[in-house]
Design a protein with these regions (language model features):
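Flexible, acidic/Gly-rich N-terminal and inter-domain linker regions that tether
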Residues: 1-53, 345-356, 360-367
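Auxiliary Fe-S-binding modules of radical SAM enzymes
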Residues: 2-5, 197, 201-367
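Core AdoMet radical
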Residues: 9, 31-105, 109-127, 131, ...
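Active-site beta-loop-alpha junctions enriched in small/polar residues
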Residues: 15, 93-95, 121-125, 148-150, ...
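Short acidic, S/G/P-rich loop/turn micro-motifs used as interaction or catalytic elements
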Residues: 94-98, 124-125, 150-153, 188-191, ...
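Alpha-helix-loop-beta-strand connector modules within alpha/beta enzyme cores
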Residues: 102-118, 165-179, 233-257
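Catalytic cores of alpha/beta
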Residues: 127-133, 188-206
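Conserved strand-turn element in the central/C-terminal portion of the radical SAM core barrel
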Residues: 170-195, 216-219
Length: 367
């Protein structure tokens, strides 16, 4: 029998905007209000609010966790493992580069000779390029690093990075030895066009494996649900079509980089919903023979309609709310629906922030 491979996560805690040397100018947690729990499918039937739809969505911690607590929690998880631990991922609400006991944590984990992965860092807490050599020596094999731009001054202004030159040098050193994946929030007129081209060229030259381009969000319909809009007053945002085209064009221009985007698109697999263009896989889906309304976000709706139509379903049964991302739908989105257009049976996105009992009440208010 093959031994099970196990990935463990080390949660260091931390607060967005606090334990990261301050908010980046474009951070979607900036100005976030202490909103009440949204409710979701994981809540108890009689009570709205659980860890997922309250603390989880806000990445709410009291601060970085002490190293002793982190170590004790990790050791407890390690003792429960029956298979081989093949990767340890460091994550949290704050930025690992700003963790006050970061070196001690890395040294502790490094003694295990298990590949380390930093799930995300802006690098703002690193001020000496030597940290790259230290990380490599302690078995770091993969890191996701927010770049924004290869221009140090743009990093300084928009990410509030006090030592942007050091951060860029660290990315460069790491990319020569391990798998580095870059994340870039794209602001039209700031770091797109020539700036983006120069940044991607630099990332390709130094050996970065992949880049995820992230569309900036500035309005509630784009997924800002913490009553914190606008993030940047007056800042333009790419339309979904513009952003999809941007991903397609940059991926074609930089074939050595694995480029994808969020909330869409992945040129390599033509996703999301790549199945829509693979007839042999579509044929495995059952024929639609009953009526129901599928509520989803504006981004997913045309793709779902294509799949439903391919299996003899009615594309009009797919109803899009104004919210673009389906898993960020809230009860307010359901309140805006025209109830006569809905079937008796309604299917909601599984990760939507909607309590089942509240959804039933809102969707049946016309009797």
């Amino acid at each position: 029998m093959e031994e099970t491979m196990v990935h463990l996560t080390v949660d260091i805690g931390g607060r967005p905007g606090v334990d990261c040397l301050g908010f980046c100018a474009y951070c979607y947690f900036k100005h976030a209000k202490d909103v009440p729990p949204f409710g979701c499918r994981y809540c108890l039937p009689f009570m709205k609010g659980c860890d997922y739809c309250s603390r989880g969505v806000k990445e709410e911690y009291s601060g970085f966790l002490p190293l002793q607590s982190v170590a004790e929690s990790f050791l407890a998880d390690l003792q429960m493992v029956t298979g081989e631990v093949t990767r340890i991922t460091i994550s949290g609400g704050g930025d690992p580069s700003c963790y006050h006991e970061f070196r001690d944590l890395i040294e502790m984990l490094g003694t295990l000779d298990i590949p380390l992965h930093i799930g995300y860092t802006s690098g703002k807490g690193f001020d000496d390029p030597e940290i790259a050599d230290f990380l490599i020596a302690n078995h770091l094999t993969e890191v996701s690093f927010t770049v924004f731009a290869a221009d140090a001054e743009l990093r300084r202004v928009w990410m509030h990075d006090p030592t942007p030159e050091a951060s860029l040098e660290i990315i460069c050193r790491l990319a020569k030895e391990i798998e580095v994946y870059a994340a870039i929030v794209v602001l039209p007129g700031v770091n797109d066009d020539r700036v983006l081209t120069d940044t991607l060229a630099w990332l390709s030259d130094i050996g970065v494996k992949g880049v995820i381009l992230m569309r900036f969000a500035n309005h509630p319909e784009q997924g800002l649900i913490l009553e914190n809009t606008p993030i940047l007053p007056g800042q333009r945002v790419h339309t979904v079509e513009e952003f999809s085209n941007l991903i397609r064009d940059t991926a074609a221009a930089f074939p050595n980089l694995r480029i994808s985007g969020t909330p869409l698109y992945d040129p390599r697999f033509d996703s999301p919903f790549a199945i829509r263009k693979i007839p042999e896989l579509l044929d495995r889906l059952p024929i639609v023979n009953k009526k129901a309304t599928i509520i989803t976000g504006a981004v997913a709706s045309p793709y779902i309609r294509t799949v439903i139509s391919a299996r003899s379903g009615d594309p009009s049964s797919v109803v899009a709310v104004d919210k673009e991302i389906a898993c960020l739908i809230t009860i307010d989105d359901l309140k805006s629906l025209h109830l006569p257009d809905l079937c008796e049976t309604v299917i909601l996105p599984g990760r939507a922030f909607v309590h089942d009992a509240e959804a039933e009440k809102v969707l049946s208010r016309d009797g």
